[in-house]
Amino acid sequence: NDVGGGLDGDGVDAGPAERVAAEITAAGGRAVACSASVATPQGGQAIIATALDHFGGIDILVHNAGNVRRASLKEMSYEDFDAVLDVHLRGAFHVVRPAFPLMCEAGYGRIVLTSSIGGLYGNRDVANYAAAKVGVIGLSNVAALEGAAEGVRCNVIVPAAVTRMAEGIDTSAYPPMGAELVAPVVGWLAHESCTVTGELFIALAGRVARAVIAESPGVYRASWTVEEVDNHLDAIRYVEAPLIFPAVPDGHNEHIRYSFELAQRSNELHGSIDQGALNG
């Protein structure tokens, strides 16, 4: 699927999708072109329906649709903010939503959603893009959690490659950054041999890595003041021994449980000290 529009998402051109479908067919595969837009619920449903009509089911879903509308945060319009979220974040939901129950019913599925280092770390002049790309990670985590018992795995690719979206950027000093350096990672995540779910994988200029969300161990106190936060800031921010709570099987509750147990241990310790003082 490729709507074939410009970088800003405007326009429709069936040519790009048809050319890729022709290349796949020429190589001995089976493919059908679709130029429906993920930016609307109807478009997302049409994309999944096309797969069902031609192949009878859906085993793999890769959402990699994108557009860019640049502006500083001071100047970005609501229209440009929504236009990017419609493709990147809502667009992911528009195809995941109709495909996910079909995969669960079949007892098998592989979903790969696309985030960006712009979502992980931010980038100037693309608040819309950054917000959408970090939102995709949350969507993937939920799909991974809800699909785990159904044989459906969902992961995120965080790629960087010189494609149509790089038009206007000076890439002359870049190392090789073709899509062929990203595609094998996506291929593995979409393959039946993929053994992970709810994870993030970076693929940039030949480097493949796992990205994680980490926390510092933190500092526990039974009560806090603004001044105490300031006094303990170095310890609060100390991340030499980070905590990682993977989304699957239960990162949400593991995160809560860690804090609860820390509070309980501290309270028990203080209770023992207080009791000892009374006995003394």
Q: Where would I find each of the regions flagged by the language model?
A:
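A glycine-rich helix->loop->beta "capping" turn
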Residues: A27-R30, T50-H63, R69-S72, Y108, ...
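C-terminal helical subdomain
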Residues: V156, Y174-L278
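Residue(s) in the substrate-gating loop at a strand-loop-helix junction
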Residues: S116
